[in-house]
Every structure is written in structure tokens, then in C-alpha cells.
Amino acid sequence: MKVLFLAAAVLAAFPVAAQDVQGRNLAAACAICHGTEGRVPANAPVIPLAGLPKDHIATQMKAFRDGSRPATVMHQIAKGYNDQQIDALAAWFAAQKR
């Protein structure tokens, strides 16, 4: 019984790990402006994403995508992501230390 429970626990962790990998891979495209792991120098013209609340990041990305938040280039970038990808990005950046 313990082996079965342990196997179920290990298998249940895989979707989370897969989302972490997907978020990290998607976030690589953000590094050019938002810095590696979402950290930027203090004088950067963009905000650091590391450690921001997941819901805030996802809401802002979706607002860029639907055009309700003004932007220079983010509205075009955000259109390339679906809800699941935005959620994975948001979770990954939220998990990074500031």
C-alpha cells in the first residue's frame, strides 16, 4: 500500500514539473527585455517580473493580448500566447526570487 501511495504521489508531481519547464522555456523569450529570470537593473525601462504575483502577471499579459492595456510592443508579443502558456509564464516568474 505504501508503494502504491508513493507511486501516485510521484506521478501527481509530473504535471507541475512539466508546467515549470514550459514556463521556464517560454520565459526565455522575455529575457531580452525583462532580464534573466525576470530580474532587470534598477534603471531599466521595463519592470522586473521576478516575484510578482502570478495573478497580476497573467492579468496584465491577457490585457496586453486583448488590447485593453496600452503598450508599445507587448500587445504584439502577448498575442502569441494562449491562456495556458500565459499561466505557465506567470507561475514561473512568480516563483523567481526578486
What feature does the model see in each segment?
Residues 38-66, 75-79:
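Gly/Gly-Pro-rich "capping" loops immediately C-terminal to redox-active cysteine motifs
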Residues 20-24:
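Short, flexible, mixed-charge glycine/proline-rich loop motifs
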Residues 69, 78-98:
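C-terminal capping alpha-helices of c-type cytochrome domains
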Residues 13-18:
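N-terminal signal peptide c-region/cleavage motif recognized by signal peptidases
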Residues 1-7:
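Sec-dependent signal peptide recognition
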Residues 28-36, 89:
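The canonical Cys-X-X-Cys-His
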Residues 34-39, 94-95:
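Detector for the c-type heme attachment site
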